[in-house]
């Protein structure tokens, strides 16, 4: 009986979702300016806003560049599209399936020395899906860490286990250096 009710519940939710998907694609998340305070927001709108999708998120620059401790960034955080929302199953999490880099100008201050506006690259998420949580995955599927030393320099694709450098090549080139893919460090070009 519970199984049947669960299927009916999800079927109804899916029907409502797909029926109104066109309308909500263009609607912003805070687009309820015309609603009166205290008015009840309908279930469908609440449900559609909670699904796993890219949403604008404020990200601390030091979270993305933990090695840049000698600088103060202005602004200290930037608005990026990142995966967020619910998966309606405790064993799943909302993760990015497509990403791209965006470059933003931020001010880098070195206290009592200098301040310059620099291009800084960040990763944005363009598509998201609900996937099994890392700690629940089968051990056969588990990815080995990128590097025991300097783990913070790498990012890892949870699907392919491929490791790549967090530091964008553009950051190194702006300093007339080259990115060493093996060490994920900016180095002087070899002649």
Swiss-Prot record:
Growth factor active in angiogenesis, vasculogenesis and endothelial cell growth. Induces endothelial cell proliferation, promotes cell migration, inhibits apoptosis and induces permeabilization of blood vessels. Binds to heparan sulfate and heparin. Pfam families: PDGF (PF00341), VEGF_C (PF14554). GO terms for biological process: cell differentiation; induction of positive chemotaxis; positive regulation of angiogenesis; positive regulation of cell division; positive regulation of endothelial cell proliferation; positive regulation of focal adhesion assembly; positive regulation of mast cell chemotaxis; positive regulation of peptidyl-tyrosine phosphorylation. PANTHER family: VASCULAR ENDOTHELIAL GROWTH FACTOR (PTHR12025), VASCULAR ENDOTHELIAL GROWTH FACTOR A, LONG FORM (PTHR12025:SF5). It is found in: Secreted. Disulfide bonds join 52-94, 83-128, 87-130. One of its GO terms (molecular function) is chemoattractant activity. Homodimer; disulfide-linked. Also found as heterodimer with PGF. Gene3D superfamilies: Cystine-knot cytokines, Vascular endothelial growth factor, heparin-binding domain. This is Vascular endothelial growth factor A. The keyword Signal applies. Belongs to the PDGF/VEGF growth factor family. Residues 1-26 form the signal peptide. Expressed by the venom gland, and probably other tissues. The keyword Signal applies. SMART domains: PDGF. Its main location: secreted. Keywords: Angiogenesis, Developmental protein, Differentiation, Disulfide bond, Glycoprotein, Growth factor, Heparin-binding, Mitogen, Secreted, Signal. GO terms for cellular component: extracellular space; membrane.
């Amino acid at each position: 009986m519970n199984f049947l009710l669960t299927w009916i519940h999800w079927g109804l939710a899916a029907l409502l979702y797909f029926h109104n998907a066109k309308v909500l694609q263009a609607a912003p998340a805070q687009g309820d300016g015309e609603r009166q305070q205290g008015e009840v927001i309908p279930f469908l709108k609440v449900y559609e806003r909670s699904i796993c999708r890219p949403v604008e998120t404020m990200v601390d620059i030091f979270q993305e560049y933990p090695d840049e401790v000698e600088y103060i960034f202005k602004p200290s955080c930037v608005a990026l599209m990142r995966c967020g929302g619910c998966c309606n199953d405790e064993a799943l999490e909302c993760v990015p399936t497509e990403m791209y880099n965006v470059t933003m100008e931020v001010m880098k201050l070195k206290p009592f020395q200098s301040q310059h506006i620099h291009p800084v690259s960040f990763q944005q998420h363009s598509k998201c899906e609900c996937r099994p949580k890392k700690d629940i995955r089968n051990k056969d599927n588990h990815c080995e860490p990128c590097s025991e030393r300097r783990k913070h320099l790498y990012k890892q694709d949870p699907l392919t286990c491929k490791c790549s450098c967090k530091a964008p090549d553009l950051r190194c080139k702006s300093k007339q250096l080259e990115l060493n893919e093996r060490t994920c460090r900016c180095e002087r070009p070899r002649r």
